[in-house]
Amino acid sequence: MAIPTSLSLFPASPSSPPKPILAAPVKPSCVTVRFKNGGGLSAGEDLPLDYETWLPKRDVKNRRRAGILLHPTSLPGPFGIGDLGPQAFQFVDWLHDAGCSLWQVLPLVPPGRRADEEGSPYSGQDANCGNTLLISLEELVKMVYCQRKSFQNHSVADIKDPLVAENNIFVISGWLEDAAYFAAIDDTLNTFSWYDWPDPLKNRHLAALEEIYQSKKEFIDIFIAQQFLFQRQWQKVHDYARMKGINIMGDMPIYVGYHSADVWANKKQFLLNGSGFPLLVSGVPPDAFSETGQLWNSPLYDWKAMERDGFSWWVRRMRRAQNLFDDFRIDHFRGFAGFWAVPSEAKVATVGRWKVGPGKSLFDAIFRAVGDINIIAEDLGVITEDVVQLRRSIGAPGMAVLQFGFGSDAENPHLPHNHEQNQVVYTGTHDNDTIRGWWDILPQEEKSNVVKYLGNIVEEDISWELIQAALSSVAKTAIIPMQDVLGLGSSARMNIPATQVKKHAYAYCRPTQVLYLKSARNGNSGMELLRLKLSIHALVNDFI
């Protein structure tokens, strides 16, 4: 019944008589079932014989899925690290056979080359280029052989024109041209950073760039050709994964390295002084990983300048990510709401302070230019209310990590009963120890919490106990590091955050013990495949 408009929240004055409330005329109730063809049935009439088949359709976006975190460098390969060759395709087959539908990789960018970066893909030399170390020589030989055979049956124009057309797509990409010139100058001068280059090159004077082009033309052509080969091989792997029903999730660091084409070619988009040196650098305050915080030393964005430019730099970056991946995780998502800014001369991150990020205006600009994109927000660490609201406003799932769940109380957001459907749950990320390594040094109190929460567990099988917990979560996506599937210890850990130089080597390129690919027909690897397949089918596929 509608509420009469004369109804007031305040009592009528006692001196005035109460006004009568007139009831609205009552209409006869009638329930009508409408059909797609426009017809209908009234209450009490017979329903069609197929009525029991009118089941609600589930939204495909809410489909539960499971995946594996494994960087391509951890695949087996004859040259020290994995690549985009046959083993990458075999891994896709393995994912398909296991019932997985997602493969997460770390950033595919060229890794940092400085000593303090230890080859980290999170301090890459370029935000858009591919890591050419991933180019498979075996696939390259196959491609050359196939092209040579084609020459026997076709004219030169038939072969050359399509290849030139494909290559020109890359040549006209602004980011690739910037990266090629940057690499050519860097190869010529070999300084610590572009800040030390002569002013004409440092400030991109056209005459100086033309001189570099003339003197380093072969280098520039080879650089572009290598990126073309990377793109071609990656696209082949990506297309094969899609054919097998596997989405590939990339990883996008929020910041870029100072010694990069991104900063050199876009100085006005960063907080630099008049000579090009950073005013403020990135980091995070003290947290669970470090008592003094983490000093990342990446230059910070000039968000006001970026907004005036329509966030065009970010739009280009997102378009490139769309070209490479089906989904992608944005590392340190909280920096879009509020970011930690540290003076560039500081030695520790504790002297920084919080500053306001671009917020939803950045994503509004991206969505207008790019359309819908599948973002996963890395929302770990110090997560304030504005970060939560920003993530929800763009519909991006956050993250939960089981290893973080057992050290406090029942309100811990990483415990399974606190998970959300629109979330991605991990046993651990690349920054965590493996489950086996984590368990070996876990304080007894936390071990007791794990046992109480998960029930009767077998400690020798702790990796699989947590894998089962992740797959059982209400979160619609679960991702398991390959090291945990194999039950490996701390020696297989990918990274140790906030560790000082020379105390560790960034192990992202250490080949994992991938026995699952080498001997899938017998031994432990075959059993692990069967076990993962049964777990995923029981806990994911049967309940979508």
Residue ranges with predicted function:
Residues K518-I544:
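C-terminal accessory segments of extracellular proteins
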Residues H96, W234-R242, F367, R391-R392:
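Surface-exposed amphipathic alpha-helices with a cationic face
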Residues M1-T32:
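N-terminal chloroplast transit peptides
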Residues A24-T73, D83-F89:
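N-terminal regions that are enriched for targeting/export leaders
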Residues Q227-V256:
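Conserved, well-ordered alpha-helix/loop/beta-strand core segments that scaffold catalytic motifs
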